[in-house]
Amino acid sequence: KDLAKQMRAAIINYTSTIGGHVGPNLGDVEALIGVHYVFDAPKDKIVIDVSHQDFVHKMLTGRAQYYLDKSKFTEIGEFTDPNESPEYDIFYAGHTSPSISLAFGLAKARSLKKEDFNIVAFIGDGSLSGGVAFEGLNNAGKLNDNFIVIVNDNQMAIAENHGSLYDNLRELRETNGQSEHNYFKSLGYDYIYVAEGNDLESVINALKLSLIHISEPTRP
């Protein structure tokens, strides 16, 4: 909790000084702390969608000084960038929806090379309506190369979300993830619902449970 508080203070100071996406980065602090606590990056691969929500990821991967030292604020990019951190930033991701397809590609390559590591795609609800996101979910659900998709369903996007997908996300929220109508299960995924994504303990417990799920060889 102290780390999350310090990170939020740094994000507010950073964005109030030079601008940037303050909301997404304040909202995913505990989620990304949990990801880096449970998974062993850079051995495990973390793909952040859009990546303007990646400040916490960068702070936890050796770049905190760029958010703490005002003289270095302009030396850090806003998006994940392999030129900036080839170990931790696998892809340059500056637009919406590709994370699931990219993670699926990593999973397929891992299988072909017979390697052993975890893969996590972190995507917001607003990005799920993108065609590339559906393509990734659809193909991965069928081909059984296990990886983890974290959906940050904060009901926030650059524009209001519309469509049947968001009706189902709302139904899942209203039923604490128990609705018999489940978009993700219909595509072949095991599903874990976390009611409070800013509760670090809940996030960590869900991520640890996800590792048990993906140990089953035929489930994404």
Regions found by a protein language model. Give the residues of each.
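Cofactor-/ligand-binding subdomain signature composed of acidic, glycine-rich
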Residues: 1-14, 184
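Cofactor-binding active-site loop characterized by glycine-rich and histidine/acidic residues
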Residues: 4, 21-143
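Glycine- and acidic
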Residues: 12-20, 85-91, 189-192
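Short beta-strand segments
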Residues: 49, 122-123, 148-152, 215
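Flexible loop/turn segments at secondary-structure boundaries
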Residues: 54-57, 128-130, 155-159, 166, ...
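Conserved thiamine diphosphate
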Residues: 108, 112-117, 163-209
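Mobile "lid/hinge" segments at catalytic clefts and subdomain interfaces of large enzymes
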Residues: 141-166, 172-174
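Residue-level detector of conserved catalytic or cofactor/ligand-binding positions
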Residues: 212-220
